């Protein structure tokens, strides 16, 4: 257990390091901590903090910097989040893809780090389908989802269809299967094709296949904004190895998606410092995340990714308010 003096010095050291990014020495702490302690006494306390792994000494400096363990103690026991300090940004109701893209940009612009948003998970359900004859054996399939997204795909058929046949197929699909998932429609068509002419059944199977692929492709799993913000941070601009690792992480997206998936199962804001998530094993990065909802159901997660040297109190506010804005925009979209 740390005594009050050690806690105050650790808090002062971390806040100073977050502010200017420079290793903090005993003389600096003596002036800024508000404690009536000599630099020698502070050096002794800092040595104790280093022994238990809360701070570390870079080889090039006599000062100290926080470790991931130190940041974790700071976030869990010393951080005070002042609510209401942020201006009230807006996120207008819109199509889900637009809301998600705007949210990622909002997170990035407010934090000056990287904004990430996991797209809402939804089944490939269609509300309406139409066929338009383009030329012989060449059709345009128009698929409308329940939330108004429109997907257009061109398909080629084995036989030529008249526009009246295309209308017959579309009417059958819309009257029997509207509101169902594409996979369920595919399975039901297999058992109900007896009542349809062979060429019409074949057309509908092809349409369902291409529709399922189109709707799945339209659901971009994670949207990332602001990667270039890392270039302005000394934490990365002075270390090309770390910068390359970060950009590889954003390009592949798989680990970010897994991390957001973990956050999806938690309530409220979560903070992952350095490699402690074991999903993104990157000691120089921290993630602040929160789930968002649609009509009371958690459907995705969003967050900010930045250096471990981030102002956690402000990031918590940014992520918390953005999750509420996304929830409101998606739940009240007209």
Curated annotation (Swiss-Prot):
It comes from the Bacteria. GO terms for molecular function: DNA binding. Pfam families: HrcA, HrcA_DNA-bdg. SUPFAM superfamilies: GAF domain-like, Winged helix' DNA-binding domain. Gene3D superfamilies: 3.30.450.40, Heat-inducible transcription repressor hrca homolog, domain 3 (3.30.390.60), Winged helix-like DNA-binding domain superfamily/Winged helix DNA-binding domain (1.10.10.10). Keywords: Repressor, Stress response, Transcription, Transcription regulation. GO terms for biological process: negative regulation of DNA-templated transcription. The keyword Repressor applies. Negative regulator of class I heat shock genes (grpE-dnaK-dnaJ and groELS operons). Prevents heat-shock induction of these operons. NCBIfam families: hrcA. Belongs to the HrcA family. This is Heat-inducible transcription repressor HrcA.
């Amino acid at each position: 257990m740390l005594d009050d003096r050690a806690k105050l010095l650790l808090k002062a050291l971390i806040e100073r390091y977050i502010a200017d990014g420079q290793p903090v020495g005993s003389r600096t702490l003596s002036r800024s901590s508000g404690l009536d302690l000599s630099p020698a006494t502070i050096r002794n306390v800092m040595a104790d903090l280093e022994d238990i792994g809360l701070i570390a000494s870079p080889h090039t400096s006599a000062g100290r910097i926080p470790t991931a363990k130190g940041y974790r103690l700071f976030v869990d026991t010393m951080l005070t989040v002042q609510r209401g300090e942020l201006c009230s940004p807006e996120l207008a109701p819109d199509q889900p893809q637009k809301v998600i893209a705007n949210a990622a940009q909002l997170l990035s612009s407010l934090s000056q780090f990287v904004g990430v948003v996991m797209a809402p998970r939804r089944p490939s359900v269609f509300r309406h389908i139409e066929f338009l004859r383009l030329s012989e054996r060449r059709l345009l399939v128009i698929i409308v989802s329940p939330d108004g997204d429109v997907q257009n795909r061109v398909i080629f058929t084995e036989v030529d269809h008249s526009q009246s046949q295309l209308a017959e197929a579309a009417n059958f699909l819309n009257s029997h299967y509207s509101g169902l998932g594409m996979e369920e429609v595919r399975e039901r068509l297999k058992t109900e094709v007896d009542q349809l002419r062979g060429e019409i059944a074949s057309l509908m199977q092809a349409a369902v296949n291409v529709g399922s692929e189109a709707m799945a492709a339209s659901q971009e799993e994670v949207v990332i904004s602001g990667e270039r913000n890392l270039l302005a941070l000394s934490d990365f601009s002075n270390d090309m190895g770390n910068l390359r690792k970060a950009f590889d992480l954003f390009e592949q997206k798989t680990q970010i998606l897994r991390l957001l998936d973990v956050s999806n199962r938690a309530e409220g804001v979560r903070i992952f410092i350095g490699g402690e998530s074991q999903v993104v094993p990157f000691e120089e990065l921290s993630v602040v995340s929160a789930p968002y909802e649609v009509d009371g159901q958690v459907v995705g997660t969003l967050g900010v990714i930045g250096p471990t040297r981030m102002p956690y109190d402000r990031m918590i506010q940014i992520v918390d308010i953005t999750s509420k804005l996304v929830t409101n925009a998606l739940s009240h979209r007209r």
